[in-house]
């Protein structure tokens, strides 16, 4: 049956195509889908290393004497045959000493842990906390995930305030080398949204005014450490307590409970 139908279907299709080709087209042109492409994340922009004057294998790197002692303690935590498991803390240590996780830092970590350099590169290129390009003294990372977009004044307003105050766009560093700004995904402080991580500190419950105050204070702290801003909520609340204040566990705590009264 299928064999008999095939010639018929082919003839029908050819005739239909011929008619369409001889008549003016009445079919509306198909519009191309408009794709929305977000800005490239700095963590995605360097999946392959490219030598630069400030980041190439010819630049020597060695851990300081103090960090060598720290490395000895770190490696002791792992069995000798599995010391390569220390790759992440050693990369972090190298980044803190050098300012960023350069190719020379990765090669030195590979040498110390006796593992192929490519394995170290894989780790450093996978985790976004390793900065494989130079960053400023203050690495400003604004969370733009849903809770921060919806919480408080919203992360869009915070991002705009940062860009205006620093005069840079995402992924850029200020001319004085003090600030690098990027947008990141959730940093786990959703109850205190919107928030920003700067180096190792969280600044939460932000408004355009408070984030500008934080950035100004950080700049002043370069010459006067006492000017450094206090991390945490900038709204005055304690950690992540309810905005309405304490609503539970308001009474004095009971004493330790025991199973037997004679204990």
Swiss-Prot record:
Role according to the record: Core subunit of the mitochondrial membrane respiratory chain NADH dehydrogenase (Complex I) that is believed to belong to the minimal assembly required for catalysis. Complex I functions in the transfer of electrons from NADH to the respiratory chain. The immediate electron acceptor for the enzyme is believed to be ubiquinone.
Record localization: Mitochondrion inner membrane
Name of one Pfam family that matches: 2Fe-2S_thioredx
Region span, Disordered: 224-263
Major place of residence: mitochondrion
Swiss-Prot/TrEMBL cofactor(s): [2Fe-2S] cluster
EC number: 7.1.1.2
Record has Transmembrane helix as a keyword: no
Transit peptide: first to last position: 1-42
Source organism (scientific name): Neurospora crassa (strain ATCC 24698 / 74-OR23-1A / CBS 708.71 / DSM 1257 / FGSC 987)
GO cellular component, one term: mitochondrial inner membrane
Keywords: 2Fe-2S, Electron transport, Iron, Iron-sulfur, Membrane, Metal-binding, Mitochondrion, Mitochondrion inner membrane, NAD, Oxidoreductase, Respiratory chain, Transit peptide, Translocase, Transport, Ubiquinone
Family: Belongs to the complex I 24 kDa subunit family.
Binding-site residues, [2Fe-2S] cluster: 143, 148, 186, 190
Name this protein carries in UniProt: NADH-ubiquinone oxidoreductase 24 kDa subunit, mitochondrial
Bound cofactor: record note: Binds 1 [2Fe-2S] cluster.
Subunit description: Complex I is composed of about 40 different subunits. This is a component of the flavoprotein-sulfur (FP) fragment of the enzyme.
The keyword Metal-binding is assigned to this record: yes
GO molecular function, one term: NADH dehydrogenase (ubiquinone) activity
Catalytic reaction equation(s): a ubiquinone + NADH + 5 H(+)(in) = a ubiquinol + NAD(+) + 4 H(+)(out)
Lineage of the species this protein comes from: Eukaryota, Fungi, Dikarya, Ascomycota, Pezizomycotina
Biased composition (Polar residues): 233-251
